[in-house]
């Protein structure tokens, strides 16, 4: 994930630890890259669910006594929780930090056009690499749902629909590939002289 690119890096959030992924994203954003994170509801947090919920409920009690509408603002959606975590790792009050934060997009589920884009993972932030087997962890989606996020079922339905379409698309592409291969084999004898001429010019 080194080097500058105008094309956005699409990260699949599933199975990553929230803080470690946010640290990597913050660094990449400050280098000038664009980052898109999908499936934020499947991010993980180390520690058992009960402790993490207590921490979040404590955070919900933080407010301005004079006028609570001034903030702090308590985001419930997993995509916004990731966004705010990244913001805390960026000098977001400077112009450089503001520009970096504008290059970040985070989504719950995997909306178009990113469902057809190649998605990457960050090995340094994967839970299976970072936590010892048997250590407790929880999902950001579950935490969000229990503190007021209303769209867990909607995102689940859309994800099921997307996965169903993806399976059928792969099956169709395999079938098409096989048909094309069989058709090529059938006409290979008839096209042999032409193929020889093409290959003599260095084309395969």
UniProtKB/Swiss-Prot annotation:
Asked if the keyword Ribosomal protein belongs to this entry, the reply reads yes
Transmembrane regions listed in the UniProt entry: none
Q: Which InterPro entries match?
A: Ribosomal_uL13 (IPR005822), Ribosomal_uL13_euk/arc (IPR005755), Ribosomal_uL13_sf (IPR036899)
GO annotation, cellular component aspect: cytosolic large ribosomal subunit
Pfam families named among the record's database cross-references: Ribosomal_L13
Q: Please verify whether the record's keywords include Ribosomal protein.
A: yes
Give a GO molecular function annotation for the protein. Answer: structural constituent of ribosome
Supply one GO BP term: negative regulation of translation
UniProt-listed Gene3D superfamilies:
6.10.250.3250, Ribosomal protein L13
Instruction: Alphabetically list the UniProt keywords.
Output: Ribonucleoprotein, Ribosomal protein
What's this protein's family per the entry? Belongs to the universal ribosomal protein uL13 family.
Could you identify this protein by its name? Large ribosomal subunit protein uL13
**What organism does this protein naturally occur in?**
Choristoneura parallela (Spotted fireworm moth)
């Amino acid at each position: 994930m080194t080097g500058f690119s105008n094309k956005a890096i699409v990260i699949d959030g599933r199975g990553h630890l929230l803080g470690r992924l946010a640290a990597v994203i913050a660094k990449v954003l400050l280098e000038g890259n664009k980052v898109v994170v999908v499936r934020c509801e499947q991010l993980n947090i180390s520690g058992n669910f009960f402790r993490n919920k207590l921490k979040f409920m404590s955070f919900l009690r933080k407010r301005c006594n004079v006028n609570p509408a001034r903030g702090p603002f308590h985001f419930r959606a997993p995509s916004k929780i990731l966004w705010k975590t990244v913001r805390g790792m960026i000098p977001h009050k400077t112009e450089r930090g503001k520009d970096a934060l504008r290059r970040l997009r985070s989504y719950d589920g995997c909306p178009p056009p990113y469902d057809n884009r190649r998605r990457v993972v960050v090995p340094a932030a994967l839970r299976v690499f970072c936590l010892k087997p048997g250590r407790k962890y929880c999902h950001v989606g579950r935490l969000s749902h229990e503190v007021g996020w209303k769209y867990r079922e909607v995102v689940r339905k859309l994800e099921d629909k997307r996965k169903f379409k993806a399976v059928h698309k792969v099956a169709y592409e395999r079938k098409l590939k096989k048909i094309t291969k069989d058709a090529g084999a059938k006409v290979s004898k008839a096209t042999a002289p032409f193929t020889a001429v093409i290959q003599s010019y260095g084309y395969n």
